[in-house]
Amino acid sequence: DYIAIGKFKKNKYKNILKGIYKGCKISSCYLSGGETAEMPGIYNKDKFDLAGFCVGLVDKEKILDGKKVKNNDLLLAVPSTGLHSNGFSLVRYILKIKNISNKNILKELLTPTKIYVKEILKLHAKNLIHGCCNITGGGIIENLPRILSANKAVEIDLDKIKTLKIFKFIKQNNISDAEMLKTFNCGIGFCLIINKKNLNKVKKVFPKKFKPYPIGKIIDFKSKKIILNGKIKF
């Protein structure tokens, strides 16, 4: 990890590290090292910049490269906890323009990102997934094509997506459906592609709050990688 901070404050630094350690523990990974830079000339005393990355290993034959994805495979949505650290530039703009200071909304915006590592590793070990992707910046529109081979596409029923209150709030501020889909996860933190016969086995791996559910299926590619039907019920 890397932390740049305006003025070193022990308690604040300690809380930041606690969060990093907690994330590593949930992900079953180690914090191998890091750097802390105190930069008063760059950052205000109460500001900090945090960055980090993870490196993993996988056997070549176990890489999910899209080759396992077949026609009529199910596309599953795994619920998110909120924004998952994406789309905050647009959200800050809305809060500023509308002069919003509702504590419930602000608290919901700070809901920690769900980390799916343990569930995904269990599914992968049992050979239950053909493809998967984290829904971050770009939403389902930009992230799903990355896990599809050149000859496959996905058909999505938007009306099956179970969105969250925070996205309903954002949508109410004159944000188009297209902008919502390309900026936010809209309630989907992770996507899985599986054989439909394995649906119940896959669902059992997740706790109740994060049970995956079908929102589409795999089809042959014709002209678009993502075919959208219906509308999200914001």
Regions found by a protein language model. Name each.
Residues 1-88, 217, 231:
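Glycine-rich anion-binding loops of enzyme active sites
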Residues 12-32, 43-48, 98-110, 114-234:
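Glycine-/charge-enriched secondary-structure boundary and capping motifs
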Residues 88-99:
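Short, compositionally biased
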